[in-house]
Amino acid sequence: MGGYGVIIRPFVNFAVGMFIFLSGYLTKENENGVYRDIIYRRIKKIIIPYIIWSFIFAIVNRRINTFIPDVFMSKCNGIYYFILIYIQMVLLIPVTFKLLRSRFSKLGWFVTPVSVFLIRYISLWFNIELGFPFQGELFVFWFGFYYLGASLKNGYINLQLSKKCLTNLCLFSLVIQGVEGFIWYWIGNFDMATTQLKMSSIITTGLCCIRAYIYIEAGDLNLNEQPVILKKFLKVLGDNSFGIYLSHMLIIRILNKLVPMVNIFPINAIFVIMISTVCVMMAHRILGKYAYVIGV
């Protein structure tokens, strides 16, 4: 993919951080400080589908013999590391709110940038090869986005930035991310050139999260005011998002085998979203009340 990949990545690097942010944003603080029920519900909802789909990919990848360690380290499917991160964030809900209420609340904002700098940049300086969980599976890389979402939702911070100013900051940070990406690319480190876990990417993602928050709170995202087709599309996409996430890598592999000529971004992305959505909806209809088992 080369330089093309370096150009494209800044426009998609915010995805995981944004989902983590939204998870924090959708978490309401309990006055009694007890979160057992929400922790149980959230983990129960994802753990069985994760194991089942991991097993499917273990079969496809012919790695049945290593399934047990692979499922614990999200190695059955590379993108499933998000589920491990999500589980860590859910387990940390009580800690998150205790930190927000404490006089040390500002420390929460340093967890992610300091971790990225110490683990990603310093390891490169000393030529230390990183393995699991320091390639992105550890909560410290993403905690800042969850902390931001929980802070905004529960009134711990109040932002006064205009939408125009924030949009300009997002665009400027995208340029900076592209510049840093090409610097790493010219050095010969394609991983750092495209990763979400570099300083410029963290800043861009944080700004995009804040922009999304202002967009939602300002009422700009009102589905009732959107064109009917767009409204239906967004609703279908939202209702089936988890199933699409779990299955779309399998759809990509099948498409690459059957019609390799469509493996060009953004054509492949459009095809994958459409086919994945249809497959998830069909599976939901066929399985009925048991659809939750595979996350559809």
Predicted features by range, described:
Residues 140, 157-235:
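Alpha-helical transmembrane segments and terminal signal-anchor/GPI-anchor hydrophobic tails
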